[in-house]
């Protein structure tokens, strides 16, 4: 009986734990795990197939091969369990212990663990303070290392060659000790006194001044402190005992034909054992030192290969010349333990099949093939059969199901009812890639899918397959029904738009039904109600598009909200509408007016319609409405009978003339080129321009002809109406196709690009209707093939970006309702070049206001701080013209180890405030990664047509208002009385009467201001003008010009204008100066006052010096009088090269990886006055003197464009050298808000170009994760080291503790990490190891004795617990609460007992129970 009870006991609950710690195992620890030493390299006996004793598969060490049976067969059956057979030494127990029992190998000579030696930076090297090269020479027996110098002048850890060693031995005898091999290294490690070393290092760190030393000491200190804290001894990095993996985890499987398939590990272990045994024998035989040494080296190499094959030297190979797969290879990479088995598991109760369309289904249903359902729900059916008494045993039930008796189908129906299943379509790029549906049993073998969910799954019916999963437990079913049911997921989490938008046929049907035609059959009739219209339509008295008058009953929300009053009341109105729209009004949900349907329904309109329905009528009504829209759309599209034929592609008659004119113009350019009037490049650019314009013109002519048709109205007059051409209707409604595609069918194909992206100058003038000739067809193949190649690359790159994003954000979960912060960001409409790119309402919708929103007219509070701004609120804000609202953002959230709901705002996929437990990090990553495949891969060359877009030369106001300048705007008044701008970052704003900003424009340096601060202007007024082709250098002081180093032929050259014959001086490049000229002088101007003294900068002793850049055209003469604001020189901007703009996916990756751009612009570190110092070779020295008089130097390459010149005042963070911005500089000089604005805007630019809508908050969430580490600048009394990077939450916790104890907290700087780096530097070593660089992460974690608190989602998935998000978060919270209350109760009981009994006396003799055998 007891045995049986024990059997049941074995299915014990897994232990509950809250953290996992990793460390180094000491030799004793390894021996304690082991069940015996593996002494022989043999595996199994080839005749008996029994494992050899003491071999790698030994049953005595690892356990029996069959359950409860020893090897020799003396003891069989359960009754002997636990007995150890005296004949073969095998314990009688379950065979599965062979999966968990380890063995060990006692190494005859210690061996260094390769991970701690070779994984960079070498940990052994750090601890010993020796170079990797030296340690390797010692370990692999090429050199000696001094261990005890004794009384000799040698130093400890000194490396000597063999020759050296023998000389020293002759010299000093045995005064000193030197060793080679791992023994020597082990001795050195043992000799280290960690506490003492840490003390000396800390003092050294305080006293040293050199950067390099500080870095070196800090690194070493970190490693040593880790050893000190974790209690791990450094000498454990040298192995004396090698653990042996349980045999079932490195199996040996017999194949047919008497051969064996074996795990590579067995080979590697065999080599180690062979070499170890040989070494033992050599040592016993007292073999010569050189032989022993060689054997020890070979043993070291064998162990290296076992642990990480190929890390050092050549990889060990098996019989077939491929490298053997070592222990390290088992866990790393895509096929390793982490990614293959722990993060990606296969699941039971699942099936897959092809999908077909199910237009008759409701939104929450899917059609499940009967046979599939039968297989998936088998256990449920077995249970039902037994309960009903149809079958007595499981076996009988199985037979019933196999025979598919009628009763089985009835039961299947019953089992399936109300039991949702989950459908998944790979690739699952966002959370809508898995949704739950209620199954409907169908015949056939294909799954039926509702058409409206296709958009979310990105599915089509051209052979796509989907997988079905069955949620088993009641909790799982509940979650599937409440959270994942398709009808509960109608919004995209990325942007809050509806995801159940009709497409293709449905759109076409609805569009066709809601179009209006002039003089349709029955036009002008009036009807009393919709039913009458339907009757007339069914009797062919009217057409769908005829204009008629109908009385329509709308259900409007009741004003009377008292008890018992109905929610909606009918309202009857006579509308002028069309037959189709009237018929559609039948399905309008309660609460929506008919006006939403009373227009042609194009795709965008339908999307807006569903969105309005969701906001006004709620989820249920919307789902029903969408379903009915779909049914109607399909029905109407079928009735419409729209088809395409060749005649629908109307080629415009004026095409030939347009193309002919273009060809003439091109000939003219060819002639000019031949005459040498234009360069080849200009000719090419112009030709391309002409053809693209021609293409546009033909397209326009074609669309004009296609989009309207002549028609006779009721009065017999001819008018034009929108065309009922099939192709036009498809494109116009948004069902299929676009203007560009129609242009290729009926206009001209236009210009094609070569594979390298350059445009071929001869266009394809034909279209598809006319047909292409051979050459045209050939040119077309370029694009088609490049498209396919790009798509393949794009998918991989996009997937990798998503993976990195998920990894960096996976632990970000909403953990509380409100963190109570008063920080936020000021949101304004996004304006580029005076155009509103994104309205304020879109940017603040669904966010929480952080300051009261005040009505600018009445100054009363509209919305208090802490209000979630919904549609009504943002519409009101927009109506009142409020242009700036401060809102909460994930970036400033003060919650530690998570986010709070208020800072995140609305959950876009649900339309309400985000719930605690929502995994917002993963959602953000999915929202950014999912559209990745739609982005382009290419970098754009700005050349030809694009770059010659008109260069702006003035700004004008777009609205009426008052001119205001930003604080950075500075200008001087010149002799003519004009205001000349002398600041680099000045901006002009237009504000309305309430002081609200309406628009803002950048005004460049050197511009002439036409309006001053405070001027009232009308729309269209010019604010400032400037010369677009040159950049001026302007003097801020008056005086007499005095040239310095302006020598013709040395620093400047004379240029004579061919046309005007005037001469100007041009500053020449240093490299082009004559040999005799000094390279360091730079041409500059000083100003003299009336007395001939140099003019000084006010308030300083510096003389005004204005330097000229290379390429500057000097416009003043020596000795000329100049006034304030006069132009001294001009720099032509023509010289700007056409830069490649990184676009698309690579740009997004570049931003999130926080890479510094190649030629980054330089920002001013401080506010102060600029001056130029002495130039070095190829660099110019720019000095900024701050207000205290301290000087900050920048060295700038000569070819860079310096945006400032002498004696100019710049503000901190202003750009002083032209180039793309470096995000790290922005963070350092302008702060978190500026950085976030930069990254959000730049990422959005890329997506906006592709027409992809993503909410800003997703990008902000990622930026928050990129900023999650800080760098300690002063450690105060904390445990950190200056210069160390630590997790922000950790540091804040530590600082709180310091303040509580009255000690000094640490101060820190923000650090921006790229997403890969941030993922790897996370506190969770499990998460980091499963991402990339597994070896390095694990090595580091083991030395530090890191503990993983299982905070993120990934760690929990890997260890197999519920993830701490959603219901899992609640589960863990409840569990922890219960544990702590249990502990309290336990303490209480213990206290009471002690109290009751005083001191417990000696325990009474326990009565002997009869044994329960």
From Swiss-Prot:
The lineage of its organism: Bacteria, Pseudomonadati, Pseudomonadota, Betaproteobacteria, Burkholderiales. Its EC number is 2.7.7.6. GO terms for molecular function: DNA binding; DNA-directed RNA polymerase activity; magnesium ion binding; zinc ion binding. Belongs to the RNA polymerase beta' chain family. Zn(2+) 2 binds at residues 819, 893, 900, 903. This is DNA-directed RNA polymerase subunit beta'. GO terms for cellular component: DNA-directed RNA polymerase complex. Mg(2+) binds at residues 460, 462, 464. DNA-dependent RNA polymerase catalyzes the transcription of DNA into RNA using the four ribonucleoside triphosphates as substrates. Zn(2+) 1 binds at residues 70, 72, 85, 88. Residues 1392-1413 are annotated as: Disordered. Keywords: DNA-directed RNA polymerase, Magnesium, Metal-binding, Nucleotidyltransferase, Transcription, Transferase, Zinc. It holds the Pfam family RNA_pol_Rpb1_2. The RNAP catalytic core consists of 2 alpha, 1 beta, 1 beta' and 1 omega subunit. When a sigma factor is associated with the core the holoenzyme is formed, which can initiate transcription. SMART domains: RPOLA_N. The keyword Transferase applies. Binds 1 Mg(2+) ion per subunit. Binds 2 Zn(2+) ions per subunit. It comes from Burkholderia cenocepacia (strain ATCC BAA-245 / DSM 16553 / LMG 16656 / NCTC 13227 / J2315 / CF5610) (Burkholderia cepacia (strain J2315)). It catalyses: RNA(n) + a ribonucleoside 5'-triphosphate = RNA(n+1) + diphosphate. Its cofactor is Mg(2+); Zn(2+). It is an enzyme of class 2 (transferase). GO terms for biological process: DNA-templated transcription.
């Amino acid at each position: 009986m007891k045995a049986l009870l024990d059997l049941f006991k074995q299915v014990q609950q897994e232990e509950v734990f809250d953290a996992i710690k990793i460390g180094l195992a000491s030799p004793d620890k390894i021996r304690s795990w082991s069940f015996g030493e593996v002494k022989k390299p043999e595996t199994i006996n080839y005749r008996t197939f029994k494992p050899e004793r003491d071999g790698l598969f030994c049953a005595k060490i690892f356990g029996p091969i069959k359950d409860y049976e020893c090897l020799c067969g003396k003891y069989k059956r359960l009754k002997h369990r636990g007995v150890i057979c005296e004949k073969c030494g095998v314990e009688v127990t379950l065979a599965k212990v062979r999966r968990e029992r380890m063995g060990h190998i006692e190494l005859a000579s210690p061996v260094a663990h390769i991970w701690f030696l070779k994984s960079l930076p070498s940990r052994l090297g750090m601890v010993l303070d020796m170079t990797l090269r030296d340690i390797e020479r010692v370990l692999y027996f090429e050199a000696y290392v001094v261990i005890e110098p004794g009384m000799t002048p040698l130093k400890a850890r000194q490396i000597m060659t063999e020759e050296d060693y023998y000389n020293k031995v002759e010299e000093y005898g045995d005064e000193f000790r030197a060793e080679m091999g791992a023994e020597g290294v082990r001795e050195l490690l043992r000799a280290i006194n960690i506490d003492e070393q840490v003390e000396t290092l800390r003092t050294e760190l305080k006293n040293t001044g050199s950067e390099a030393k500080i870095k070196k000491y800090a690194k070493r200190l970190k490693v040593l402190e880790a050893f000190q804290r974790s209690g791990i001894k450094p000498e454990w990095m040298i192995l004396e005992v090698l653990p042996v993996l349980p045999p079932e985890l490195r199996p040996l499987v017999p194949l047919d034909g008497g051969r064996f398939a074996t795990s590579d590990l067995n080979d590697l272990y065999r080599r180690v054992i062979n070499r170890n045994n040989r070494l033992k024998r050599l040592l016993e035989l007292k073999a010569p030192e050189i032989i022993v040494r060689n054997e020890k080296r070979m043993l070291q190499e064998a162990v290296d290969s076992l642990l990480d094959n190929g890390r050092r030297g050549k990889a060990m190979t098996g019989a077939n010349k491929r490298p053997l797969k070592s222990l390290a290879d088992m866990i790393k990479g895509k096929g390793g333990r982490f990614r293959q088995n722990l993060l990606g598991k296969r699941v039971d109760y699942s099936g897959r099949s092809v999908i077909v369309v199910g237009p008759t289904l409701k939104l929450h249903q899917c059609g499940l093939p009967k046979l599939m359902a039968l297989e998936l729900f088998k256990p449920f059916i077995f249970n039902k059969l037994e309960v009903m008494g149809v079958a007595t045993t499981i076996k009988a039930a199985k037979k019933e199901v196999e025979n598919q008796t009628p009763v089985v189908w009835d039961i299947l129906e019953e089992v399936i009812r109300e039991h949702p299943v989950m459908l998944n379509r790979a690739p699952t790029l966002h959370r809508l890639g898995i949704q739950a549906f209620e199954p409907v049993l169908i015949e056939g073998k294909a799954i039926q899918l509702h058409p409206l969910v296709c958009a979310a799954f990105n599915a089509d019916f051209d052979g796509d397959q989907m997988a079905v999963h069955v949620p088993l437990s009641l909790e799982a079913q509940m979650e599937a029904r409440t959270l994942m049911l398709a009808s509960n997921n109608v919004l995209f989490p990325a942007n809050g738009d509806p995801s159940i938008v009709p497409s293709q046929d449905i759109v076409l049907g609805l569009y066709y039904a809601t179009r209006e035609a002039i003089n349709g059959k029955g036009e002008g009739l009036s009807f009393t109600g919709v039913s009458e219209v339907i009757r007339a339509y069914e009797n062919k008295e009217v057409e769908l598009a005829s204009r008629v008058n109908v009385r329509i009953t709308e259900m409007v929300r009741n004003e009377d909200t008292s008890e018992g009053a109905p929610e909606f009341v009918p309202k009857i109105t006579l509308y002028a509408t069309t037959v189709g729209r009237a018929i559609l009004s039948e399905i309008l949900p309660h609460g929506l007016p008919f006006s939403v349907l009373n227009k042609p329904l194009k795709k965008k309109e339908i999307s807006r319609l569903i969105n309005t329905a969701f906001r006004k009528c709620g989820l249920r009504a919307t789902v029903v409405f969408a379903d009915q829209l779909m049914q109607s759309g399909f029905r109407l599209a079928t009735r419409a009978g729209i088809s395409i034929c060749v005649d629908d592609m109307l080629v415009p008659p004026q095409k030939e003339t347009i193309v002919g004119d273009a060809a003439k113009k091109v000939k003219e350019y060819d002639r000019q080129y031949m005459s040498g009037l234009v360069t080849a490049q200009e000719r090419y650019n112009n030709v391309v321009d002409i053809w693209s314009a021609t293409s546009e013109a033909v397209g326009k002519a074609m669309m004009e002809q296609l989009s309207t048709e002549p028609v006779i109205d009721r009065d017999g007059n001819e008018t034009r109406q929108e065309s009922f051409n099939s192709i036009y209707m498809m494109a116009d409604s948004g069902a299929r196709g676009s203007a560009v595609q129609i242009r290729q069918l009926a206009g001209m194909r236009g210009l094609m690009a070569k594979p390298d992206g350059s445009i071929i100058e001869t266009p394809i003038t034909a279209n598809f209707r006319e047909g292409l000739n051979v050459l045209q067809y050939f040119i077309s193949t370029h694009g088609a093939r490049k498209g396919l190649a790009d798509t393949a690359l794009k998918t991989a790159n996009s997937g990798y970006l998503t993976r990195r994003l998920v990894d960096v954000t996976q632990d970000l979960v909403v953990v509380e309702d409100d963190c109570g912060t008063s920080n936020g960001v000021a949101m304004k409409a996004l304006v580029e070049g005076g155009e509103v790119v994104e309205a304020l309402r879109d940017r603040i919708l669904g966010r929480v206001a952080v300051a009261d929103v005040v009505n600018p007219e009445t100054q009363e509070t509209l919305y208090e701080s802490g209000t979630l701004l919904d549609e009504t609120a943002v519409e009101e804000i927009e109506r009142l013209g409020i242009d700036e609202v401060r809102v909460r953002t994930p970036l400033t959230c003060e919650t530690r180890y998570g986010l709070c709901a208020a800072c995140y705002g609305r959950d876009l996929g649900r339309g309400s405030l985000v719930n605690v437990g929502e995994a917002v990090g993963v959602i953000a990553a999915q929202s950014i990664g999912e559209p990745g495949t739609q982005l382009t891969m290419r970098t754009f060359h700005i050349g030809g047509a694009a770059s010659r877009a008109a260069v702006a030369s003035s700004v004008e106001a777009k609205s009426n208002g008052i001119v205001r300048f930003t604080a950075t705007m500075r200008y001087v008044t010149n002799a003519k009385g004009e205001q000349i701008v002398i600041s680099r970052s000045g901006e002009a704003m237009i504000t309305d009467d309430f002081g609200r900003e309406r628009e803002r424009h950048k005004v460049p340096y050197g511009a002439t201001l036409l309006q001053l601060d405070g001027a009232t202007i009308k729309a269209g007024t010019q604010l400032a003008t400037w010369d677009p082709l040159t950049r001026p250098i302007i003097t801020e002081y008056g005086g007499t010009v005095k040239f310095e180093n302006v020598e013709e032929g040395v620093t400047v050259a004379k240029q004579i204008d061919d046309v005007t014959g005037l001469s100007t001086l041009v500053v020449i490049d240093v490299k082009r100066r004559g040999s005799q000229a000094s390279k360091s002088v730079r041409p500059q101007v000083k100003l003299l006052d009336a007395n001939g003294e140099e003019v000084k900068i006010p308030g300083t002793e510096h003389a005004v010096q204005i330097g000229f850049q290379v390429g500057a055209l000097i416009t003043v003469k020596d000795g000329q009088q100049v006034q304030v604001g006069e132009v001294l020189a001009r720099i032509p901007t023509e010289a700007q090269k056409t830069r490649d703009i990184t676009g698309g996916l690579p740009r997004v990756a570049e931003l999130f990886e926080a890479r510094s751009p190649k030629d980054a612009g330089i920002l001013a570190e401080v506010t102060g006055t600029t001056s130029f110092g002495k130039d070095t070779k190829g660099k110019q020295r720019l000095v900024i003197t701050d207000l205290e008089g301290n000087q900050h130097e920048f060295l700038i390459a000569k070819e860079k464009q310096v945006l400032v010149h002498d004696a100019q005042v710049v503000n901190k963070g202003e750009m002083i050298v032209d180039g793309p911005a470096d995000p790290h500089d922005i963070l350092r000089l302008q702060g978190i808000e500026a950085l976030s604005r930069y990254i959000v805007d730049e990422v959005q630019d890329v997506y906006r170009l592709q027409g992809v809508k993503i909410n800003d908050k997703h990008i902000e969430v990622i930026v928050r994760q990129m900023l999650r580490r800080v760098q300690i600048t002063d450690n105060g009394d904390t445990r950190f080291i200056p210069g160390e990077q630590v997790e922000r939450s950790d540091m804040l916790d530590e600082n709180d503790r310091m303040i509580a104890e009255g000690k000094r907290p640490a101060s820190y700087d923000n650090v921006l990490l790229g997403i890969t780096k941030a993922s790897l530097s996370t506190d969770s070593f499990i998460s980091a190891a499963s991402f990339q660089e597994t070896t390095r992460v694990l090595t580091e974690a083991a030395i530090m004795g890191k503990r993983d608190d299982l905070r993120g989602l990934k760690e929990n998935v890997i260890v197999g617990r519920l993830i701490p998000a959603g219901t899992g978060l609640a589960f863990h919270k409840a569990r922890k609460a219960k544990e702590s209350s249990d502990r309290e109760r336990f303490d209480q009981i213990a206290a009471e007992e002690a109290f009751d009994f005083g001191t417990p006396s000696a325990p009474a003799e326990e009565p002997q129970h009869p044994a329960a055998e």
